[in-house]
């Protein structure tokens, strides 16, 4: 893969991920890794939680830069820290990976392509482009049904047509990170969906691309019922104008 001189940064929020993060880093394709400018690991656990990185890992992957939160601030907050630093570094593209390996690093070349060529501003890696693939990948049936129902409701409410709003495999151009006022979005698991919503409403070009689904024995910190009700809250807030951001 040729990144055409683009400065690409990978952002990885990490919380109690010492056992899984090394495997995620090892799965980044070699040709992509060689062309990465920086890998930003955001330690979101604070001092009381074991760190996901150690001296051995940092020596093996010298492109890693570790960013620390003094206490657990949340999934969205960790991304904000990463993207803020990516912009400071002059990144042209920021790609998000999960430290637990749920989203395949092997897909990075294909997902990066629309951003490298300039045909998209934001890339959504969607598990729901193929319902059969989602189920084969181990997505629990209750999550599968909830994803479909919530996504259809969101598309209806927002006047958009995306295959899902609940994937954590997101990639952004520098333009996307400057057009969307991401600092004003949620610090929680809703950050990704809000980025997608606000980006689309601001006219960003979104590539909705299929990715494989993987559910293994990784620990999830998302509470499904609470999350579902909070999605309804996001829809309510949208209709109240929370995501209009006039003049930005």
Q: What do these predicted ranges mean?
A:
Residues 17-30:
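Short, well-formed alpha-helical segments that are part of the catalytic scaffolds
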Residues 36-46, 67-69:
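Short beta-strand/loop segment that forms part of the nucleotide-sugar
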Residues 1-8, 159, 183-248:
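Hydrophobic helical membrane-anchoring modules
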Residues 17-20, 46, 75, 104:
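Donor nucleotide-sugar binding loop of glycosyltransferases
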Residues 8, 37, 63-65:
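Short, conserved active-site loop motifs that form the nucleotide-linked donor/cofactor pocket
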Residues 71-88, 93, 105-189, 216-226, ...:
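Acceptor/aglycone-binding surface of glycosyltransferases and processive sugar-polymer synthases
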Residues 43-53, 101:
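A conserved acidic beta->alpha catalytic loop
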């Amino acid at each position: 893969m040729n990144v055409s001189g683009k400065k690409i940064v990978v952002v990885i929020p990490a919380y109690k991920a010492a056992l899984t993060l090394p495997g995620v880093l090892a799965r980044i394709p070699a040709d992509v890794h060689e062309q990465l400018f920086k890998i930003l690991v955001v330690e979101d656990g604070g001092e009381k939680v074991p760190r996901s990185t150690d001296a051995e890992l940092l020596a093996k992957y010298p492109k890693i830069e570790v960013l620390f939160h003094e206490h657990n601030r949340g999934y969205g907050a960790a991304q904000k820290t990463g993207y803020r630093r990516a912009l400071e570094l002059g990144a042209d593209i920021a790609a998000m990976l999960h430290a637990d390996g749920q989203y395949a690093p092997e897909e990075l070349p294909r997902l990066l392509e629309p951003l490298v060529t300039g045909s998209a501003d934001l890339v959504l890696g969607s598990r729901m482009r193929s319902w059969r693939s989602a189920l084969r990948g181990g997505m629990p049936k209750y999550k599968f049904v909830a994803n479909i129902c919530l996504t259809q409701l969101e598309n209806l409410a927002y006047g958009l047509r995306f295959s899902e709003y609940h994937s954590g495999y997101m990639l952004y151009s520098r333009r996307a990170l400057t057009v969307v006022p991401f600092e004003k979005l949620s610090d929680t698991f809703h950050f990704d969906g809000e980025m997608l919503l606000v980006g689309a409403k601001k006219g960003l070009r979104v590539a909705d691309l299929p990715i494989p689904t993987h559910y293994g024995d990784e620990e999830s910190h998302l509470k499904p019922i609470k999350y579902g009700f909070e999605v309804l809250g996001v829809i309510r807030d949208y209709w109240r104008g929370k995501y209009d951001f006039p003049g930005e």
